[in-house]
Amino acid sequence: TCALPICMEKSPLLSKWASSQRAFLWNDKAVESDSLLGNGRKDLGCEDAFVLYTNPMDDLFRIVEANPSDGKAMEYALSYLLLAKDMDNVVGFVEKYFGAPALKTLPTPVQECLLFYSDYYATMDVKFAVSHGMPQEDVERRQAYDLDWIIAHGVTEENLARFKSFKEKYGKAAQSRNPKSAMASFRETFWYYLLFTQISDN
């Protein structure tokens, strides 16, 4: 038997690639210093687990937990949550990982999510929410993620100004016959996606 890269050196199509990988055989230092392989090794969790045993988020969270410097894992995890419109978990993710090596700044869609979330609960009538079945402690817990909190966690003044513009325009558009069309200039935002795009069950 032989190590895979050595065996693959005999392949006409893969010989060059296999030869380039020979340097990593039985050489932990070389693996760890390589940008791709080193990052992949850091992604390995402390315990064995089946990939996709439950859902992709479980795998992504394990990777992010093991290696907070993995920018791709951070992006995939946040993208998954945003596409699912799971704002509670976006906020929780930012609360836990903002400031980590791969999350020194927040992507614009994540900032847009925090802005909407903070504003939504800040303006919520607690008594009305409780009367419709939402526990008061849940409302108050979400209201703790106020404007000061989201600014401290990466929301910029520029995006705050954009959100104010969005709210003003949406207030007018909501009175029109076709609010979706009236808000077309915000089509590329999380706000538009949240309000006007339905998630398919298929």
Locate the predicted segments by residue.
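Short, small-residue-biased leader/transition segments that mark boundaries at the very start
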Residues: 1-4
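Solenoid-like repeat scaffolds
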Residues: 6-13, 60-68, 94-104
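Extended amphipathic alpha-helical segments with heptad-repeat/coiled-coil character used for oligomerization
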Residues: 6-36
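Generic helix N-cap/helix-start motif at coil->alpha-helix transitions
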Residues: 15-16, 31-36, 56, 67-75, ...
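Repeat-mediated protein-protein interaction surfaces in helical alpha-solenoids
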Residues: 18-24, 40-63
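Structural register within alpha-helical repeat arrays
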Residues: 76-77, 112-113, 117
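Residue at a conserved register position within TPR or TPR-like alpha-solenoid repeats
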Residues: 79-82
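C-terminal functional modules
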Residues: 118-120, 126-202
